[in-house]
Swiss-Prot record:
Main location: membrane
PANTHER family noted in UniProt: ZINC FINGER PROTEIN-LIKE 1
Domain of life, source organism: Eukaryota
Phylogenetic lineage: Eukaryota, Metazoa, Ecdysozoa, Arthropoda, Hexapoda
TM segment ranges: 256-276
Record's keyword annotation contains Endoplasmic reticulum: no
Organism of this sequence: Drosophila melanogaster (Fruit fly)
Membrane topology summary: Single-pass membrane protein
Phosphoserine, modified sites: S215
Protein name: Zinc finger protein-like 1 homolog
Length: 299
């Protein structure tokens, strides 16, 4: 489990394979609507992923996408065509995820931003309204709704814009909503509302910490190198810095560490000096303690 980087700071075990960060359900809807998100344990077992729709094989960047309650993402047009082809009397449990066979329709008592976003898509088609227990739409209403893109309910909280930066093999590409303008910028996720409009060229957050944050033990950029293999020198340095780092730990811990290290160093020094001194006197003692000395014969 990890902590999401959004202002809500929620604890979650869901992990974005593309950006390699922990994400909560609010971030899935607002900042990662087309990213591959599964559990962190699944990412540890296999970090490879394909950012394509499993129904049509094309990239998820093309067209509107919908995320099911199992967190699998598909093109809405592909999923709608697949489920609409089923018989009209298909039970709600018969509509299942193409990837994991989990029921598409969320439970009525489920409180989830992902479920709310999914319901907004399902309410646009008759097979979805049938599973949700809503009244069916007429042909005129269904045709008019096809021209209107479904709006995600949670996007109302973001009044100005939501920027999501995706890293591809050819470089970095910025996708801006809702106008869809593309530009090149460094990787980050910025959420800005109408109450705090950004200045020209300045997209920094207006929040300032009350107290200056200390650099974490083991490096300043922990998110980029926390999955790299550590060398023995780095592990030893990290272990020793825990005793020297100024924090709320009791002061006697540092003193105990210094005293213990000094005693061990002194014992090691005495042992080495005794071993070296005993090795030089062995040759002399062997001649005096030999009961049958052999005289040297000179020719």
């Amino acid at each position: 489990m990890g902590l999401c980087k959004c202002p809500k700071r929620l604890v979650t075990n869901q992990f974005c394979f593309e950006h390699r960060v922990n994400v909560c359900e609010h971030c899935m809807v607002q900042s990662h609507p087309k990213c591959i998100v599964q559990s962190y344990l699944q990412w540890l077992r296999d970090s490879d992923y394909i950012s394509n729709c499993t129904l049509c094989g094309t990239t998820l960047e093309q067209g509107d996408c919908v995320r099911l309650v199992c967190y699998h993402v598909f093109h809405w047009d592909c999923l709608n065509a697949r489920q609409a082809a089923l018989p009209a009397n298909t039970a709600p449990r018969g509509h299942q995820c193409p990837a994991c066979s989990v029921e598409i329709f969320p439970n009525a008592n489920l409180v989830s931003p992902v479920a709310d976003a999914l319901k907004s898509f399902l309410s646009q088609v008759n097979w979805g309204r049938n599973g949700l227990g809503l009244a069916l739409l007429s042909e005129e209403q269904s045709s008019s709704l096809k021209a209107i893109k479904p709006k995600v309910a949670s996007q109302a909280a973001v009044s100005n814009m939501t920027k999501v930066h995706h890293i591809h093999s050819g470089g970095e590409r910025e996708r801006t909503k809702p106008n869809g303008h593309d530009a090149v910028s460094p990787h980050s996720v910025l959420l800005m509302d109408a109450f705090n409009p950004p200045s020209a060229g300045d997209y920094a957050s207006s929040r300032r910490p009350l107290l200056p944050r200390q650099s974490p033990i083991g490096g300043t950029d922990r998110d980029d190198n926390k999955y790299q293999r550590r060398t023995p020198a780095e592990l030893f340095s990290r272990w020793t810095r825990r005793f020297y780092a100024p924090s709320s730990r009791p002061p006697w811990r540092r003193t105990w560490f210094l005293v213990t290290a000094g005693i061990l160093a002194f014992v090691l020094f005495v042992y080495l000096m005794a071993w070296l001194g005993r090795g030089g006197s062995d040759a002399v003692d062997e001649g005096w303690n030999n009961p049958n000395p052999q005289p040297n014969h000179y020719e």
